[in-house]
Regions:
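Catalytic cores of alpha/beta
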Residues: 150-158, 215-229, 289-299
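Core AdoMet radical
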Residues: 82-97, 103-199, 205-208, 214, ...
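Canonical Radical SAM [4Fe-4S] cluster-binding loop centered on the CxxxCxxC motif
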Residues: 53-95
Length: 348
């Protein structure tokens, strides 16, 4: 990744990449470069063709369910970090099931369960029981938790989990150390290898992402895609997905903003992903504005979140207007707060 000089690519390199039937790694590097910015419309046209060829008009909806926000890491950009003064909460199993019922009643069939990265507060057995509960209500169950060992992933799969998503945050090792000041998350290689351990543990699919804006987004976008590219060759029958989140403000630090990656650049990255990895699912979360999400699902994205709350135990308030007053604080601010029905109607 360090050797990637994106400024060396020319308009001719980008044109050649778009003319090739199969996108090589070198072509992908050209499509991520500044030289590709004037070709965004052509990239979008090509991406739309690839999406239609492999996914048709299908767009999947899911909702994240945060079940705990205790964390043992000190990540300077995250609202859950252990030094941030927020209201901490861990849902009981009764509360988890109540939240799931509310979500399922909205018509959602896929859920992504998340915790803060604390084994002490959210151990594997706790997460496993939450998966068992989720099986009663949802057809597809994802996890976004702290990285675990392959035998623990196998246990979670047996409990009902179908896929695992892990944010590497940034693939820049030096910057990674400056952003993660304490906790198990400081161990870069263990996190990097999490998706492979999940596949070894029997998970059907794995998701990848860098958090754009933490470091050079050209290089992080390249590394995220290559992470999948090489793992695909080792585990060709697994399902793979990419997310492309940008930094969002957090409680007690509203100066964190995704100013380093603009929407046009984000669109370029997503189109490049689709052209380079035509079979890979692409998720766009509620971190992005509704106009962007409504547009990108017509081009490259295959999955979007709906009815989102990043607080703990906050879905009843979100869906019914009833506020228990006991929810835990959110991880970050969302940009698209539309309900499931509103997102569904926008997709029609």
């Amino acid at each position: 990744m360090d050797s990637y000089d994106y400024n060396k690519y020319t308009a001719r390199d980008v044109q050649n990449a778009l003319e090739h039937e199969t996108c090589s790694v070198e072509d992908f590097k050209a499509l991520l470069s500044p030289a590709a910015e004037p070709f965004l419309e052509r990239m979008a046209q090509r991406a739309k063709i690839e999406t239609g060829k492999h996914f048709g008009n299908t767009v999947y909806l899911f909702t994240p369910l945060y079940i705990a926000n205790y964390c043992e890491n000190y990540c300077v950009y995250c609202g859950f970090n252990c030094y941030n003064d927020i209201h901490r909460k861990k849902l009981t199993f009764e509360e988890i099931e109540h939240e799931m019922k509310v979500i399922a009643d909205s018509g959602i069939e896929e859920i992504l369960m998340l915790t803060g990265e604390s084994r002490a507060q959210s151990d594997v057995e706790y997460i496993g029981e939450a998966c068992r509960l989720a099986k009663k209500y949802f057809r597809n169950i994802g996890l976004e938790i702290y990285p675990v060992n392959s035998d623990e992933y196998r246990y979670l799969h047996e409990c009902g989990a179908d896929y695992v998503t892990v944010f590497q945050e940034t693939y820049d090792n030096v910057k990674y150390e400056t952003l993660h000041l304490m906790g198990h998350k400081r161990v870069f290689p263990y996190r990097f290898e999490a998706q492979e351990r999940a596949l070894m543990g029997g998970m059907r699919g794995v998701g990848f992402s860098a958090l754009l804006g933490l470091s050079d987004f050209h290089k992080d976008a390249l590394a995220s895609a290559l992470h999948i590219y090489y793992l695909q060759r080792k585990y060709p029958y697994a399902e793979y997905s990419l997310s492309c989140p940008r930094l969002r403000p957090i409680i007690n630090n509203d100066k964190i903003n995704p100013l380093d990656v603009h929407e046009k650049q984000l669109c370029q990255i997503l189109c490049a992903y689709r052209i380079f990895l035509p079979y890979v699912g692409i998720t766009v979360s509620s971190r992005e504005q509704k106009h962007f999400r409504d547009g990108i699902v017509k081009i490259a994205a295959t999955k979007v979140s709906a009815g989102v709350s990043t607080g703990i135990g906050d879905h009843e308030s979100k869906y019914t207007g009833k506020d228990s007053g006991e929810s835990g604080d959110e991880q970050f601010e969302i940009s698209d707060g539309r309900s499931v029905d509103e997102v569904y109607q926008a997709l029609l």
